[in-house]
Every structure is written in C-alpha cells, then in structure tokens.
From Swiss-Prot:
Region (Disordered): 1-22
Molecular function terms from GO: 5S rRNA binding; structural constituent of ribosome
Ranges of biased composition (kind: Basic residues): 8-20
Family: Belongs to the universal ribosomal protein uL18 family.
Keywords: Ribonucleoprotein, Ribosomal protein, RNA-binding, rRNA-binding
Highest rank taxon of the organism: Bacteria
Gene3D superfamilies named among the record's database cross-references: 3.30.420.100
Subunit structure: Part of the 50S ribosomal subunit; part of the 5S rRNA/L5/L18/L25 subcomplex. Contacts the 5S and 23S rRNAs.
This protein's name: Large ribosomal subunit protein uL18
CDD domains (UniProt xref): Ribosomal_L18_L5e
Record-linked HAMAP family: Ribosomal_uL18_B (MF_01337_B)
Gene from which the chain derives: rplR
Length: 120
C-alpha cells in the first residue's frame, strides 16, 4: 500500500513525540508549518501548558512586506518566540519539528531561535 505525504508526516510526528517531551526545566519548542503560515510554541508537557507562542498571524509579522509563508517570516517567528521565552526565563528547549522535514521554513525557525539565545 502506497503511503501518501499526509500519512508519512503523521507517522514521523508520532515517532518524534514518543521520544521528545517537554519538562518545566526544558520545555518543547513545537513548530507547525501550514501552506500560508508558521506557528511556534514553547510547551511544558508535564503540566500541559503553552508557555510562549508566536506565529505569522500576529499583527507585527503579518504586516511585513514579505509574505507569511517565506523563510524570512519564519526567521522572524523564531526570533520572536526566543525573545518571549527568554523574558519568561526559559533558556533551553527541545526542538519538535512536528513531523516536517528539517529544511526550509522549519530550519529557519530553529536557526533564528538559536541565534536569539535558545539552547537546543
């Protein structure tokens, strides 16, 4: 039976989530990429709380000249989520690529978050 792209992404995400869990000391930086936007959340899986979030749906990022589905927009989201996490005292996270390949916009979020001071 041939596996389509959606099923493959779902299986990859399940495999990743079995291995990765966020703790209060080192929460999970989860990235979700849609066709139009990109979302990033810092999640404490023990208490099931979202500690920090950023996305291209927010007004400062949405009004940019580049689109919301570009690597530049993903870089801005990564920088913003890292700044908000540092304000809350979070310096180390575990990266969850959400079943997507570590390439393009997902990689741009990770690189920008690292440059802004998050360790993973």
């Amino acid at each position: 039976m041939k596996v389509d792209r959606k099923t493959a992404t779902h299986r990859r995400h399940q495999r990743i989530r079995r291995k990765i869990a966020g703790t209060p000391e080192q929460p999970r930086l989860a990235v979700y990429r849609s066709n139009r936007h990109i979302y990033a959340q810092v999640i404490d899986d023990v208490h099931q709380r979202t500690l920090v979030a950023a996305s291209t749906l927010e007004a400062p990022l949405r009004s940019g000249e580049e689109g919301t589905a570009t690597c530049e927009a993903a870089t801005a989201v990564g920088r913003l989520v890292a700044e908000r996490a540092k304000e809350k005292g979070i310096t180390a996270v575990v990266f969850d690529r959400g079943g997507k390949l570590y390439h393009g916009r997902v990689k741009a979020v990770a690189d920008a978050a690292r440059e802004a001071g998050l360790d993973f």
